């Protein structure tokens, strides 16, 4: 929204923006999939305490270096949660090397592609997104639909728009692993703050419901007639 206004300042007072709706019910339904159908290994993993990232394994754009460094800082501070990463890509070997260099092989697990990532999202303690840039960042919304706490880089474009007004998650500066770790600890251990975030997450979810989007379309059509 803000980027469009910057490109066309002379039209800023006339711009109306409408989000694409999300199929919230489908996301929730897949998140509630019966884990008893999983292999014993998958079931053991999903029943553990873990943070989750879902991303194409692109070491540059997705900035796995910051993600893995931030997680290493958290481990040094004593957290017990593991880090699972869902996705595949040509950066896998480079990312595996990053994990090895941090001696995190037992704690950072590359799960590959998953037919249903939402059930893994549902069971995670929080969702981390470390990209240097994004088109919009729909995966952040998908995490919110499952009432997950979200920690995201403040990258262009999307995260700020998704996680603010009201504040529905935490943002850290792109490439700042220390700040990433600080934000995770804040969300992980501040129970009062968790309640505040959950309240705001419910408000944010409504913005992307089909009924809400349809109402905005209806209003714009009426005003233009």
Positions of predicted regions on the chain:
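Aromatic "clamp/platform" in nucleotide-sugar-dependent glycosyltransferases that forms part
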Residues: 113, 132
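A structural motif in glycosyltransferase catalytic domains
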Residues: 51, 63-70, 83, 180, ...
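A conserved mid-protein helix/loop that constitutes part of the nucleotide-sugar donor-binding site
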Residues: 58-73, 90-96, 138
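A short, well-ordered alpha-helix in the C-terminal region of glycosyltransferases
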Residues: 179, 186, 193-207, 215-219
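Short hydrophobic beta-strand element within catalytic cores of glycosyltransferases
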Residues: 149-153
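A short, active-site helix/loop in glycosyltransferases that binds the activated sugar's phosphate group
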Residues: 1-17, 22-26
């Amino acid at each position: 929204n803000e980027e469009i206004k910057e490109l066309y300042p002379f039209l800023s007072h006339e711009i109306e923006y409408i989000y694409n709706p999300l199929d919230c019910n489908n996301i929730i339904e897949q998140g509630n999939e019966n884990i008893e159908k999983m292999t014993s290994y998958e079931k053991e993993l999903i029943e553990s305490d873990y943070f989750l990232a879902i991303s194409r394994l692109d070491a540059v754009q997705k900035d796995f270096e910051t993600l893995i460094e931030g997680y290493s800082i958290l481990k040094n501070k004593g957290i017990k949660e593991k880090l699972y990463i869902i996705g595949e890509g040509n950066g896998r070997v480079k990312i595996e090397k990053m994990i090895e260099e941090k001696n995190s092989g037992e704690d950072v697990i590359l799960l590959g592609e998953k037919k249903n990532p939402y059930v893994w999202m549902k069971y995670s303690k929080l969702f981390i997104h470390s990209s240097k840039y994004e088109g919009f960042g729909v995966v952040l919304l998908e995490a919110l639909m499952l009432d997950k706490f979200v920690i995201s880089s403040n990258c262009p474009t999307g995260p700020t728009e998704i996680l603010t007004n009201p504040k529905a998650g935490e943002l850290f500066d792109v490439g700042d692993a220390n700040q990433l770790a600080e934000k995770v600890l804040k969300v992980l251990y501040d129970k009062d703050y968790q309640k505040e975030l959950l309240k705001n997450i419910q408000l944010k979810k409504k913005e992307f419901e089909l009924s809400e989007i349809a109402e905005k379309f209806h209003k714009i059509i009426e005003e233009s007639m």
